[in-house]
Amino acid sequence: MIEGLDWIVIVISLAISLGIGWWAARKNSGDTESFFLAGRCMPWWLLGVSMVATTFAADTPTLITDWVRTEGVSKNWLWWSLVFSGMLTTYVFARRWRRSGVMTDVEFYELRYSGLGGQILRAYRALYLGLFFNVFIIAVVSLAAIKILGVLMGLDAWQTILLGAGVTMLYSVVGGLRSVLLVDCFQFAL
């Protein structure tokens, strides 16, 4: 169970995360591109750290540890296979996406594919990612956090969800993508 000094470190790290959100909000110029894309001026290494930090959420290490424990080291190939698509996205597609000036992948598909086929692809991506994939990922991360914080802090499911979602939504809504990237970097360093 977590003791006094642990609580102090947790409260300070949450306060720093919120502080980063407020600082990022002051840096944003108030337009859509500044909020959703951080003005398109973030350094490549910060974007990379954010991507890596995202895979270090409570769910991924827990899942991979379980895979190795139950099925052996060879099960790592399941997630190692994603390295190729990640590298392709980073070094080939990201440059083209940036050059096109779009904000979202659906907007990119709108430029690339027209007609009924393009509409079907955009609708599929919006429904699949918006209603299935993202909801599933958030549920898995939340379940991992509920289990971990239940043991470490004695929090029940609702307390964990309200605390985690509350802090995350606050710094995200206040500071936009700039805030998310900087908080990811801070939490990765922790």
Language model features with spans:
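Short helix-coil transition sites and intra-membrane helix breaks within transmembrane domains
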Residues: W23-K27, T54-D59, R96-S100, N134-V141
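Short helix-boundary/re-entrant hairpin motifs in multi-pass inner-membrane proteins
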Residues: R112-F132
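Short amphipathic alpha-helical coupling elements at transmembrane boundaries
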Residues: S34-L37, E107-S114, A126, V151, ...
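Membrane-interface "cap" regions at the ends of multi-pass membrane proteins
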Residues: M1-P61, S172-G175
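Transmembrane alpha-helical segments of multi-pass small-molecule transport proteins
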Residues: I10-I12, M51, V83, R122-Y128, ...
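Membrane-interface helix-loop-helix modules in multi-pass membrane proteins
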Residues: F36-M103
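Small-residue-rich segments of transmembrane alpha-helices in multi-pass membrane proteins
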Residues: M42-S50, Y113-Q119, Q187-L190
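Interfacial loop-to-helix junctions that mark the boundaries of transmembrane helices
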Residues: M1-V9, R69-W80, L149-Q159
